[in-house]
Amino acid sequence: MGNRGSKGGRLGRTRRLRLLCQAAWSALTNGYAAGFLEKKIYTGKLKSLCVPGLNCYSCPGALAGCPIGSLQAVLSSSSFTVSCYVLGFLMMFGTLLGRFICGWLCPFGLVQDLLHKIPFPGKKKNLPGHRFLIYMKYVILVLFVILLPSFAVGVTGNGNPWFCKYICPSGTLMAGLPLGLGNPMLRTALGKLFSWKVFLLVLTVVLSVKYYRPFCKYVCPLGAIYGLFNPISLYRFRIEEKTCIQCGACQKVCKMDIRVWKTPDSPECIRCGDCKSVCPTGSIRSTMERMRAEGRGKAEAYEKQLETEQV
């Protein structure tokens, strides 16, 4: 009983820490309070930078831009050149953290986590057809973020940010609603496209109450990009095969429904840490933990060697 309580305590602490980190990061990156009060967008120097998570450029409080929005802006421009900054930004954070960003640093991920805490009968991890639907975000990435902005251009040679304009529910929640409904001039200009975006937002909200992070699992192109880096990112999970008993506790607690003991580097893993907290043998460790453990081991071995030499 004590062991189970200990695991439950670790899981609770991990989840509270993650929630605190998500909330603090969201508040920090959307800290332009005047934007919410005056219904305007921050246009200072920080806006030329990106934050790692899905955080709409047009959110009244946003202090920086969204990498997906920035990528589309570059690709849809008539003076298109490969943006070393945007690509380098995505590669840097992908190589360092992978989908840890989705689990700990994404404001819209926080929104979905909070929605899923709402009591609702028959909660489930996945939508029907999950094993096929997880590939939809890659289709959206290629089609709506890369191809259409690049090639579906008007007479001026400029394209549209297709994902932001026609799909992104995060932009509707964080920018469309507060700016559109709060500004009388913008409110009169709202039309069918805004109604479509609100419909997608409502659908995402309803699904998020019953299913865990449906947008992250099936739609988010940023998660698709970071997921490709999961196997090589500096921060990732490793299984100690000598101590793993393949009990399945990690998959049972995993809300992304991953067989962690088999595929710890799955592109679907958001590195929330729940699996590490419940592992009965402590066989799931992050690369950082392994590096610290190896460092301690080397230090202890060195101290023993010194003691032996002194004797």
Regions found by a protein language model. Give the residues of each.
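Non-ligating segments of multi-cofactor redox enzymes
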Residues: 1-260, 267-311
